[in-house]
Amino acid sequence: MSGGAASAGFTVLIPARLASTRLPDKPLADIGGIPMVVRVAQQAARSRAARVVVAADHPRILEACAAHGVQAVATRADHPSGSDRLAEACVQLGLADDDVVVNVQGDEPLIAPALIDAVAALLPARPEADMGTAAHAIHAREDFANPNVVKVVLDARGLAHYFSRAPIPHARGHADTAWWQGGQAGVPAGCAPLRHIGIYSYRAAFVRAFAALPPAPTEALEALEQLRALWHGHRIAVHVADAAPGPGVDTPEDLERVRSLLG
């Protein structure tokens, strides 16, 4: 069976937390008359997922999902991270250890169904990997230098070697990003800068195991939860997408941009 076929029964989980510092009630932000988290679920439903479930921390999110026919489960409001919320949802849904789960962020209303499918397919195709995620080529030096743009370096097997907010890989003898002029020309094989895309796949057993792992020093330093997996010796397979995904929503300005794109 091919990796794509083997991933057809996966579950998409969308963690949704009502509180947001920069955009109050973000999951419920109106986009063309539809709450944002519902938009995300509708996009995910166009993938090959067997089911799409919102893991919500507030009754208002549950009510919004119910009003639009989206399955949702209530999770505790005091989870320290989205991964902890997913672990609780996996237990509530009774997922088997080997069931594939794709974590789609609740602020990605333009997430491409094909990207979800590709990340889900990583685990059946790469049984040595505990997680899957995605990245795309960086083409602008300002993105390479931006600490809000997370970079990932891969090894020869296409597994994540490290994630960082710093501009990696770094060329010795050059200041910051001066070695790289954008694009692929003149870049040694395997060294082209890649931007990490915040979507993950796991087997349900690993979701629960990950939530129980102690945080890693690098995770705290960089504020990147995925570094916990690497620190503890787990492998993360990476799908390199052909293009950047649609914009996510972190701020009111982001919301207006997405509203304009969706008409």
Swiss-Prot record:
Its main location: cytoplasm. It is found in: Cytoplasm. Keywords: Cytoplasm, Lipopolysaccharide biosynthesis, Nucleotidyltransferase, Transferase. It holds the Pfam family CTP_transf_3. InterPro entries: Cytidylyl_trans, KdsB, Nucleotide-diphossugar_trans. Its EC number is 2.7.7.38. It comes from the Bacteria. GO terms for cellular component: cytosol. Pathway: Nucleotide-sugar biosynthesis; CMP-3-deoxy-D-manno-octulosonate biosynthesis; CMP-3-deoxy-D-manno-octulosonate from 3-deoxy-D-manno-octulosonate and CTP: step 1/1; Bacterial outer membrane biogenesis; lipopolysaccharide biosynthesis. GO terms for biological process: CMP-keto-3-deoxy-D-manno-octulosonic acid biosynthetic process; lipopolysaccharide biosynthetic process. GO terms for molecular function: 3-deoxy-manno-octulosonate cytidylyltransferase activity. It catalyses: 3-deoxy-alpha-D-manno-oct-2-ulosonate + CTP = CMP-3-deoxy-beta-D-manno-octulosonate + diphosphate. Transmembrane segments: none annotated. Belongs to the KdsB family. Activates KDO (a required 8-carbon sugar) for incorporation into bacterial lipopolysaccharide in Gram-negative bacteria. PANTHER family: 3-DEOXY-MANNO-OCTULOSONATE CYTIDYLYLTRANSFERASE (PTHR42866), 3-DEOXY-MANNO-OCTULOSONATE CYTIDYLYLTRANSFERASE, MITOCHONDRIAL (PTHR42866:SF2). This is 3-deoxy-manno-octulosonate cytidylyltransferase. It comes from Paracidovorax citrulli (strain AAC00-1). The gene is kdsB.
